[in-house]
């Protein structure tokens, strides 16, 4: 697990399957950034999702935070986990506000790359399919470009701190999610997912560099 530093943060690049990378990390005692690589196409379900079956060739795992499913493909998403210990100046007790600062980091990174982005500061807006598909709804701290969600954020909190899991879309097919999850009506669901989320027109390397540069 290569380790380095980005300002006040420890930076690690863990290896393993998507399931292994979603495993608990133990007590959170320092600011930590985990840059995760997707090794195989994987559908990641929210903690409360059940009864989902997909075609062969796509793994299915469950994360420890809520929300809808996310499809991870190699090269299709920049997946970064940000860990903040309880008591840190970035710690926010109010869950509805706790991701705002992180959304602003992503928005600033995108601005450096010439992309105007907006951080959602309102309540969770799941829409019709947000309970099934993460990128079908929008929650606090998540980032929209041109009105379409491009960076999703979920969080898992315990006594030691918070683990924020961020997914910046580098590729997106709402119709594929409709097919994988069997959403109906098919045309309506596909149109909603296609218009509600969008891939960023950039590569992961420059985006990660800009993101790390804006971490407080």
Where in the sequence are the language-model features?
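Long, positively charged amphipathic alpha-helical accessory segments at protein N-termini or as interdomain linkers
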Residues: 103-127, 156-216
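Active-site loop/lid in soluble adenylation, ligation, and acyl-transfer enzymes
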Residues: 1-56, 61-63, 69, 83, ...
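Short, conserved charged micro-motifs
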Residues: 53-55, 90-95, 176-178, 206
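A short mixed-secondary-structure module that forms the rim of ligand-binding clefts
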Residues: 92-107
């Amino acid at each position: 697990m290569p380790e380095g530093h980005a300002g006040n943060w420890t930076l690690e690049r863990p290896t393993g399957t998507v399931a292994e990378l979603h495993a608990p990390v133990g007590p959170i005692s320092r600011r930590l950034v985990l840059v995760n690589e997707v090794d195989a196409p994987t559908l990641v379900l929210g903690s409360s999702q059940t009864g989902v079956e997909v075609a062969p060739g796509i793994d299915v795992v469950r994360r420890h935070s809520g929300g809808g499913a996310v499809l991870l493909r190699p090269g299709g998403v920049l997946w970064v986990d940000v860990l903040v210990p309880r008591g840190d100046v970035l710690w926010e007790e109010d869950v509805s506000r706790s991701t705002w600062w992180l959304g602003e980091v992503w928005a600033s990174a995108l601005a450096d790359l010439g992309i105007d982005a907006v951080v959602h500061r309102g309540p969770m807006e799941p829409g019709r399919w947000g309970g099934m598909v993460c990128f079908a709804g929008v929650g606090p701290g998540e980032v929209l470009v041109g009105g379409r969600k491009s960076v999703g954020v979920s969080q898992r909190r315990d006594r030691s701190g918070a683990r924020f899991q961020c997914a910046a879309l580098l590729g997106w097919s709402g119709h594929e999610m409709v097919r994988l999850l069997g959403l109906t009506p098919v045309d309506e669901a596909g149109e909603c997912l296609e218009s509600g989320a969008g891939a960023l027109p950039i590569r992961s390397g420059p985006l990660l560099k800009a993101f790390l540069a804006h971490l407080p």
